[in-house]
Amino acid sequence: MLPRPAHLTADNAARFKDQSVVEVYPLRLPYPPEVFDILAGLITDEPRAVLDVGAGTGDIARGLVRRVERVDAVDFSAAMIAKGRTLPVGDHPHLRWIHGAVETVALDAPYALITAGESMHWMDWEVVFPRFGDALTPGGVVAIVHRAELPAPWQDGLEVLIRQLSTMQNYQPFDLIDVLEKRDLF
C-alpha cells in the first residue's frame, strides 16, 4: 500500500480555516461549465441529492444546486462556509451548508452523488469511503473532481513555485486516484 503523502497533515489542512486563505480562494480557476453537466448526468437514482465534501466556498455545490433536488455542502472551515454563502447561488434554498469534518458530521442520506472537489486528499480515507458507501443510493456515484491542469510549461513552473514559496516544505505532487486505487478503498 502506498503511504499517505507527508504534507497531508491536520496542521496543513487547518490552513484552510485562515481568513487570508479564504479571501483568495474564489480566485482559483473555475470549473468548466461542462463539469456540472457531467456531474448531473451521473445521477441516475432518486432522490437527486448531492453531498459535496470538503466543499470550501462551494464551487461544486453552487454549480450543481439548480440541477438537483438538494445539495449538502460539508466543510470543516466555518470561514469557507461563510464566504461561500456570500458568493453567487450561495444562499440558494436547496443548498444546505454543514460545518464540520465529513468523517463525523451527521449526514442526511441517501445521496445519488457524492462530490469531492480537490479536497479528498485531506480526508481520512479509511473513514470516509465506508461512510460514502453507507450514504449512497444503490446506483450512487462518488466523483473526485479536479480543475483542469495548466499546460505543461505552466504546470512545471507552478510546481517549482509551490516548492519555493509554500510554507508546506514537504509538499510532493502525487496522483490521488492512483493512491486510492492501490489502497483498495472502493
What are these regions (language model features)?
Residues M1-D45:
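Conserved class I S-adenosyl-L-methionine
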Residues T44-D45, V65-E69, V89, D124, ...:
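Short conserved AdoMet
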Residues R48, E69, A112:
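Conserved acidic residues
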Residues L51, T57-T104:
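Class I SAM-dependent methyltransferase SAM/SAH-binding core
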Residues A106-I114:
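A short acidic, Gly/Pro-enriched loop at the edge of an enzyme's catalytic core
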Residues A116-G117, W125:
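A short beta-strand submotif of the Rossmann-like class I SAM-dependent methyltransferase core
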Residues M123-F132:
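A short, conserved alpha-helix within the catalytic core of class I
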Residues G133, T137-F186:
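Conserved catalytic/acceptor-binding region of the Class I
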